[in-house]
Design a protein with these regions (language model features):
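Short, well-ordered beta-strand segments
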Residues: 44-46
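Catalytic core of pol beta-like nucleotidyltransferases
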Residues: 1-29, 35-40, 50-102
Length: 102
């Protein structure tokens, strides 16, 4: 199903509204097909944060905080530690769109 630019912008706003209350989050980055496709299958979201909680705990926390968006379009949420080591996924994320920065 095609998604208009206005709908994409609305989803991005809702995502930020759902996550911005978490004090450990410093940046939210959208990357992947959501940025370039008219009919993306999902939204890839990198969340740069400084928490010491385990990856899975953070991923589940952020999924709960973004349920309203996930009901409209599936989300792939990737919590990243501030200053994460170089890896393949960071290349894709570096080409993404920062939608929130503290």
């Amino acid at each position: 199903m095609a998604i208009s630019v206005e709908q994409k912008n609305s989803l991005k706003r809702e995502l930020v509204e759902g996550l911005q209350m978490a004090p450990e989050i410093s940046k939210i980055i959208i990357f992947g097909s959501f940025l370039v496709d008219d009919a993306p299958n999902d939204m890839d979201v990198a969340i740069v944060q400084n928490s010491n909680l385990p990856y899975l705990t953070l991923a589940m926390k952020y999924r709960k905080m973004t349920r309203a968006v996930a009901r409209q379009l599936p989300l792939d949420i990737i919590p990243l530690k501030t200053g994460a080591k170089k890896c393949a996924i960071l290349d894709a994320i570096s080409k993404g769109e920062v939608i929130y920065e503290r």
